[in-house]
Amino acid sequence: MTNVSADSILGALLGTAVGDALGMPIEGLSHQNVRTYYKGIKEYRDDDQRGDLSAGQWTDDTQMTFALVRVLTKFPDRPAAWPSAAVEEYVRLRSEARRWGNTTTTAIDRLAGGTSPAESGVPDRATDGAAMRAAPLGIWWATQDVDRDDAFEAVRPVLAVTHRHPVALVAGWGQAAAVHTLLAQSPDTFERAAFWDAMLEAATWAEAQLDATDRVSSRLQNLTDRLDAFPLDLRDACDGVGVRAEEAWPFACAMVARRAHLLENTLLSGINVGGDADTTGAMMGAMLGALHGWAAFPSEWQKGLEAADRLSEEARGLSEVLG
């Protein structure tokens, strides 16, 4: 159990939303098209191509993350209640869905039709939707007196409500473990090698628990000696930065490990690689926020974020009940 500051918790949660909003306009674009259409992302921008969202607005990454914030705030001591509570939150959000991925949409449609949360998750799509929403679970783990086995038994079922593929769950567990690890550190105490070893160990352990292939841990291993490489080279080492869990999450981890002390530079550099940029942005934002705290984010990012007051209130509510 770690003595976690409220600012660090806000950093992990609101950092998710900031990264999501920065990446929103270029979601799905190649790096070349990011350069062509946007000349690179340096601030919140309207989505000029799709025209559906404006500068500072966020997508499903933030919707799903804060759905879990509300679940954990309501049931901080009852992980067994989380899957059913998540169902209520997810189904309620259907009318407000923002760019939900196919995996999430399929699962929540099943839930709305009466499928149980134990069976609703999609078992054959190894996408990154579990990882994108895992920050609140890492916060919960960091603030509770639970060991790794108990934390895993709490985290896995609620992520599996939408994503049951073992590789998706490995990445989801990895993101929770990353936030858990970084909440115990600061930019001054961060050690890259120790962080990377922890991420590789977390992925390898989860793969064993889930009887999963080594698609996540092998990507991390492939990145081990390349953490000073350029972002585009890290992308290539991951075989891309699309929606596959074994691409997006290892890339986000590598970007944070590469320059963890540079919050703004790291987040923008990773997002501008393109691909599933709102989700890699959300995951990087959560990790960097856990390490640096919310106060370290640029004021224009704080003020320009959609519904910042509501998100801050919900994040503070979780911080208080976990206190």
Language-model features, listed with the residues they occupy:
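Structured, active/binding-site neighborhoods that engage oxygen-rich ligands
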Residues: M1-G323
